[in-house]
Amino acid sequence: MRFHTFNIGKPHIDAWWARNRRLGIITAGFSGEPGDRGDTLLHQMEEGDWVIAYSNGHGFVGAGRVGPVATYRLLSVDELPSGWEATHRHLRQVDWVHAVASLVEAIPAKEVGRQAPRQTK
């Protein structure tokens, strides 16, 4: 089992974080193409690994267990749900075990002695 720190990416707003929690996912952006960095990052995680979510300007917002690799999806622009807040199209299932309800409740990186991750672009 490994631990991955992962930036939830833009926009850094409650609605985007709530969507990640509600859908039970972590997402990545980059170019939104097969084989890009987002694809690689989400495929490097093994089922049962922990993902520690971070939001720029706020801090750490959640921790969850990564689902099976079979839950990875690359959505086309047409498949994005109505109101999708981000440009991210790579998704992977996460069972959010610990999470703040609002970004204002985030734990700042300096409080845990870590730097902010830069993983989702």
Short names for language-model regions:
Residues 45-46:
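Short, well-ordered loop/turn sites that connect or cap secondary structure elements
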Residues 60-72:
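Short beta-strand-centered aromatic/proline hotspots
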Residues 1-15, 25-37, 74-121:
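Contiguous surface segments at macromolecular interaction interfaces
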